[in-house]
Swiss-Prot record:
Annotated keywords: Acetylcholine receptor inhibiting toxin, Disulfide bond, Ion channel impairing toxin, Neurotoxin, Postsynaptic neurotoxin, Secreted, Toxin
Tissue: Expressed by the venom gland.
Family named by the database record: Belongs to the three-finger toxin family. Long-chain subfamily. Type II alpha-neurotoxin sub-subfamily.
Native species: Dendroaspis viridis (Western green mamba)
PROSITE patterns named among the record's database cross-references: SNAKE_TOXIN (PS00272)
Main location: secreted
Signal peptide segment: none
GO molecular function: acetylcholine receptor inhibitor activity; ion channel regulator activity; toxin activity
UniProt-recorded name of the protein: Alpha-elapitoxin-Dv2b
Known function: Binds with high affinity to muscular (alpha-1/CHRNA1) and neuronal (alpha-7/CHRNA7) nicotinic acetylcholine receptor (nAChR) and inhibits acetylcholine from binding to the receptor, thereby impairing neuromuscular and neuronal transmission.
SS bond partners: C3-C21, C14-C42, C27-C31, C46-C57, C58-C63
């Protein structure tokens, strides 16, 4: 499997056994100025949802592109 990974945001081969791509988004102290933080990567299972964190998982190559920002 290949997934986009941060910080490079380039497709990379996932380690053996990690067949899920994920996009995790959350707000930090700069959220109102910069927007949500994003983390992209590979996992063996979809990460557990935590309060205030959005998670999207998928299982095809490069299915987790960096979220598109709305122009201001």
């Amino acid at each position: 499997r290949t997934c986009y990974k941060t910080p490079s945001v380039k497709p990379e081969t996932c380690p053996h056994g990690e067949n899920i791509c994920y996009t995790e988004t959350w707000c930090d102290a700069w959220c109102s100025q910069r927007g949500k933080r994003e983390e992209l990567g590979c996992a063996a299972t979809c990460p557990k949802v935590k309060a205030g964190v959005g998670i999207k998982c998928c299982s095809t190559d490069n299915c987790d592109p960096f979220p598109v920002k709305n122009p201001r």
